[in-house]
Amino acid sequence: MQISKFFKFVFISVSLCGSLLFPQMANAYPVFAQQAYDNPREATGRIVCANCHLAQKPTEVEVPQAVLPDTVFEAVVNIPYDTKVQQVTASGTPGPLNVGAVVILPEGFKLAPKGRMSDELKAKTKGVFVQPYSKTRPNILVVGPILGEKNREVTFPILAPDPAQDKSVHYLNYPIYVGANRGRGQVYPSGEKSNNNTFTSTAAGKVTAIEAGDKGTTRVTIQTAAGEAKEQTVPAGLKVSVKTGDVIQADQALSYNPNVGGFGQAETEVILQSPNRVKGMIAFFFTVTVAQILLVLKKKQFEKVQAAEMNF
């Protein structure tokens, strides 16, 4: 128990340090959703990651058609995007995109322990830390942020439940929901915009000045109809879309949209198959096959008898 607590402390410490050292990855970290939402999937079916990642992008998931109880299988989440594209980091400099994903499994399904994973599956998941969403929801798995260039395909190792051990689980067809993002979010959980978003004017008026600010920011001064000068700061890394002398409206964009990423959802199904049903199907097909063979042999024997009688 003490060892487990120690590793948990180390993991949290490393995560916090990573958020400080690599701010461009911090606002995609699943901890934001984990802290704010007990369940990442809303009643409408929408996954809450879409609250911060506003653009829609494709996401695909692959799972076996059917699995046996108490067996390990994999769910492969595909997060397609152009690796040549770079995003605006928190510091305003261009950088590679990071990715993250969430897999919402039926209750009873959970993350497969390493001791149950094959060598091939261990190799596929090496360097990718998959964790349960929370202690109360072990059936929801999250990963990220991780560098997207090498992880456009993320493998989740999953352990299927055994109805013989868990009476709440049955041999049925179960849905699996998946969400995946590439790139930073446009909005922080607090509602504040990140610098991976379009910044708009807070007032209507005339642009009287555009000046370089601190740390790569840009100051835009707008003179309103009342003669009041309002100064707005466009974050570092964003390209200003207005020029001095322009007459603009309130909520008009002051910068171009820098976002190159986005979030996507997908869903699929998996059948928890009964071993007895599989054995029964095999026995049935075997019986049918043997019966057909016997019928063919009997038919040939009958034809030989008929031919012999005709010759006689």
Swiss-Prot record:
Its GO CC terms? Answer: chloroplast thylakoid membrane
Give the source's domain of life in one word: Eukaryota
A Pfam family (short name) is Apocytochr_F_C
Q: Which residues bind heme?
A: 29, 49, 52-53
Cofactor(s) in the UniProt record:
heme
Q: Which UniProt keywords apply?
A: Chloroplast, Electron transport, Heme, Iron, Membrane, Metal-binding, Photosynthesis, Plastid, Signal, Thylakoid, Transmembrane, Transmembrane helix, Transport
Q: Which residues form the signal peptide?
A: 1-28
Query: Tell me, what is an example of a GO biological process annotation in this record?
Result: photosynthesis
Q: Entry cofactor note text?
A: Binds 1 heme group covalently.
Q: Where in the cell is it found?
A: Plastid, Chloroplast thylakoid membrane
Report the main location listed first in the record: plastid
One Gene Ontology molecular-function label: electron transfer activity
Q: Which HAMAP family match?
A: Cytb6_f_cytF
Similarity remark? Belongs to the cytochrome f family.
Protein name (Swiss-Prot/TrEMBL): Cytochrome f
| Organism in which the protein naturally occurs | Emiliania huxleyi
Q: Which gene encodes it?
A: petA
